[in-house]
Amino acid sequence: MQAIILAAGMGKRLKELTQDRTKCMVQVNGVALIDRMLHQIERRHLSRIVIVVGYEGEKLMEYIDTLGIRTPIVYVHNPIYDKTNNIYSLALAKDYLCQDDTLLFESDLIFEDSVIDQLLDDPRETLALVDKYKSCLLYTSPSPRD
């Protein structure tokens, strides 16, 4: 099991909070969003963490290197982050996506530790977790073996 984190975006709507850093480096209660997420993932002993970077990518990678994460981290660069979206960033990581079961995260999320455990413990082959307070289209795709 691996994790892919999409962290290439500019976070324009956060204005001055992201002028010189990525959205996932914004701090909430004194902890950067990416710091919290990486430590939550680290406790699950996954095989690797793939992070797609773009805007302020060098700064983000340097910051992550200071966190002491022991799980191997692989970086994928989205050079046209300012013209694309998360689907494009995910496509850039497709080679990794095909190699292992994957937990996919957007880098600016805050969630309880139990959320990852619920995903890992669920017996279904394909699963999506969404915010219950927002309308969305959610479906479970059948297994290719069915």
Language-model features, listed with the residues they occupy:
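A generic "binding-loop/recognition-motif" signal
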Residues: 10, 21, 56
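Short amphipathic alpha-helical segments
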Residues: 17-19, 38-39, 62-65, 115-118
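Short catalytic helix/loop segments, enriched in acidic residues and glycine
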Residues: 23-33
